[in-house]
Regions:
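Accessory N-terminal region flanking or inserted into the helicase ATPase core
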Residues: 3-97, 106-111, 134
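Conserved helicase motor core of SF1/SF2 NTP-dependent helicases
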Residues: 95, 102-178
Length: 178
């Protein structure tokens, strides 16, 4: 079998596969985040074929799905998929605030699109300079091109002015930076 690293102080036994660093599980998670079939992601050849082989990947993906079904376990992505499937049950909302929007995956953007139709006001906050989850399927370009009124904060309240000024030096050298 595949040894899975896990860490969850509340329920290790049922969540061990969610926080692993195994390349098979990472690829399965990325396919879910990208909202594509695992075979499609495999065929993109973005992985090391010496490490990940189609046979075991297909088996692990189907076994994981069955394991979660039998044990009535849902991970975060399963919750998102359930909301998408049952969108007619989502009530009308006054406002929604989504932070770190630069790190949303296509699956999460699909839910955002549904929530837009269910709310009066939607606020997205994020910083494309801080997009760090492309490896997991995050779609920073969707964040950048999302229509709406854009407010760019010129000053950070998280770091000192001196640190901010120094960080602007390398950022300003990047072509196409906003």
């Amino acid at each position: 079998g595949i040894r899975v690293n896990y860490s969850d102080k509340y329920n290790e036994e049922q969540t061990h596969y969610l926080t692993c660093n195994n390349p098979y599980f990472q690829m399965i998670g990325k396919a879910i985040n990208l909202d594509i079939d695992i075979k499609e992601l495999f065929n993109r050849n973005e992985h090391d074929r010496k490490i990940i082989d189609w046979g075991p990947l297909k088996n692990i993906a189907s076994t994981l799905k069955e394991y979660k079904k039998i044990n009535e376990i849902m991970d975060f992505n399963d919750l998102i998929k359930t909301l998408i499937e049952r969108q007619d049950k989502i009530p009308k909302l006054k406002a929604i605030f989504i932070d770190e929007a630069q790190d949303l995956s296509p699956l999460q953007w699909k839910l955002v699109d549904i929530l837009k139709t269910k709310t009066e006001h939607m606020y997205l906050a994020g910083d494309d300079d801080q997009a760090i989850y492309a490896w997991a399927g995050a779609d920073v370009n969707r964040f950048i091109t999302e229509p709406g009124r854009e407010i760019i904060l010129k000053h950070s309240r998280r770091i000192s002015k001196a640190v901010q000024k120094q960080s602007e030096i390398p950022i300003s050298r990047i072509a196409g930076i906003r």
